[in-house]
């Protein structure tokens, strides 16, 4: 079902988070067609300090302004760079320093787009906010549920799992019922400047730079040895923070005597010894886990876990739903999967679903081996 349109007797004021992309542009158009009083707001979340617009903020603002001018709505601007640094970026650095691989987009949604932006919009007198995320919401039995977007290729519920039901209840998601080609068609129909603009990829504050170059500005590299599972030293790494579980590219391993031609993969980041443990083969047994542990789960709405519960989960964006059993333990939460899960990565998020309902999720802290023989 589509997000509810306002009644004739109550014209609600909605402020749309305008990113300068096609999804938020079309969101504004759809809300206007539904009769809302629509305004836009452009958020700047990163201060470029090197004279180069890596985040393309200037270009994105110009595109957002062009769209707002075209459809005849006001565009506000807000700078949340301080909030982003304190609540997102510093955590991002701490996670890498601890050897984990974080996902800043999830924290950005919780702390910036559905907190700082929401608070700012309410201060401006908005009744609701709206974003161009491919998700849906449903109001039922006095609570608001977060649902997967209708387009399985674009569903973004994975990234919004840490946003609470109260925030979801104040948000409209106009493109959540649409598929991407439909969104672009609407943009072209209305002559929007963003109709053919490419989707943004990667982390905003890194932009076009190489990730290793960016991270090196903030964290000192700590080179160490690359070892096989048998303990043989076969190379050196420039820093564990530059690598992630399941990584194949950029290891600099090759031409080893008596080794097969199978590619090498990162299996373990040994923080205690600053060693990168690698193995050959896409299906190396050390790459697979049967369970994971998270100490804290952010629920969209509270759920009953007085006994183990059958759900599905994703351990990465765009992964298919994986059947699992979730249980509350003394140390947090443990999800046991029906099938082996490849490259379960501490620092990334596990997100739980009940059908199309996104229940919530948490940061992966421990990935348990698929078999007891896999001594990591």
Swiss-Prot record:
Residues 103-105 are annotated as: Interaction with target base in tRNA. Its EC number is 2.8.1.13. Residues 154-156, 316-317 are annotated as: Interaction with tRNA. Keywords: ATP-binding, Cytoplasm, Disulfide bond, Nucleotide-binding, RNA-binding, Transferase, tRNA processing, tRNA-binding. ATP binds at residues 17-24, 43, 132. The record marks 133, 348 as: Interaction with tRNA. It comes from Pseudomonas syringae pv. syringae (strain B728a). PANTHER family: MITOCHONDRIAL TRNA-SPECIFIC 2-THIOURIDYLASE 1, TRNA 5-METHYLAMINOMETHYL-2-THIOURIDYLATE -METHYLTRANSFERASE. GO terms for biological process: tRNA wobble position uridine thiolation. GO terms for cellular component: cytoplasm. It is found in: Cytoplasm. This is tRNA-specific 2-thiouridylase MnmA. Disulfide bonds join 108-204. Belongs to the MnmA/TRMU family. The keyword Transferase applies. It is an enzyme of class 2 (transferase). InterPro entries: MnmA-like (IPR004506), MnmA-like_C (IPR046885), MnmA-like_central (IPR046884), MnmA-like_central_sf (IPR023382), Rossmann-like_a/b/a_fold (IPR014729). Pfam families: tRNA_Me_trans, tRNA_Me_trans_C, tRNA_Me_trans_M.
């Amino acid at each position: 079902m589509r997000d509810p349109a306002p009644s004739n007797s109550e014209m609600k004021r909605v402020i749309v988070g305008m990113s300068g992309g096609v999804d938020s542009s079309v969101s504004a158009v759809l809300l206007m067609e539904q009769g809302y009083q629509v305004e836009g707001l452009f958020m700047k979340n990163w201060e470029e300090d090197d004279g180069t617009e890596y985040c393309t903020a200037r270009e994105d603002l110009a595109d957002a302004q062009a769209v707002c001018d075209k459809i005849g709505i006001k565009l506000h601007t807000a700078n949340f760079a301080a909030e982003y640094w304190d609540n997102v970026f510093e955590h991002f650095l701490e996670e890498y320093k601890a050897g984990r691989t974080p996902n800043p987009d999830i924290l950005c949604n919780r702390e910036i787009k559905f907190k700082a932006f929401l608070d700012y919009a309410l201060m401006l007198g908005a009744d609701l906010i709206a974003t161009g995320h491919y998700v849906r919401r449903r109001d039922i039995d006095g609570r608001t549920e977060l649902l997967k977007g209708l387009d399985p290729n674009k569903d973004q519920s994975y990234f919004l799992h840490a946003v609470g039901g109260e925030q979801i209840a104040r948000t409209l998601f106009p493109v959540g019922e649409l598929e991407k080609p439909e969104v672009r068609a609407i943009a072209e129909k209305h002559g929007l400047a963003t109709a053919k603009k490419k989707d943004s990829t990667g982390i905003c504050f890194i932009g076009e730079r190489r990730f290793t170059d960016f991270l090196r500005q903030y964290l000192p590299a700590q080179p160490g040895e690359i070892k096989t599972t048998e303990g043989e030293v076969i190379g050196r790494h420039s820093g564990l923070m530059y690598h992630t579980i399941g990584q194949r590219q950029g290891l600099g391993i090759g031409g080893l005597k008596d080794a097969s031609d199978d590619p090498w993969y990162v299996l373990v980041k040994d923080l205690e010894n600053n060693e990168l443990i690698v193995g050959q083969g896409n299906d190396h047994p050390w790459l697979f886990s049967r369970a994971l542990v998270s100490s804290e789960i952010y629920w969209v709405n509270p759920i009953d876990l007085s006994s183990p519960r059958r759900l599905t989960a994703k351990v990465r964006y765009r992964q298919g739903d994986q059947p699992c059993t979730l249980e509350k333990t003394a140390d947090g939460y443990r999800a046991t999967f029906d099938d082996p899960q490849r490259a379960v990565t501490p620092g990334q998020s596990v997100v739980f679903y009940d059908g199309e309902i996104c229940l919530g999720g948490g940061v992966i802290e421990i990935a348990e081996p698929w078999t007891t023989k896999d001594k990591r």
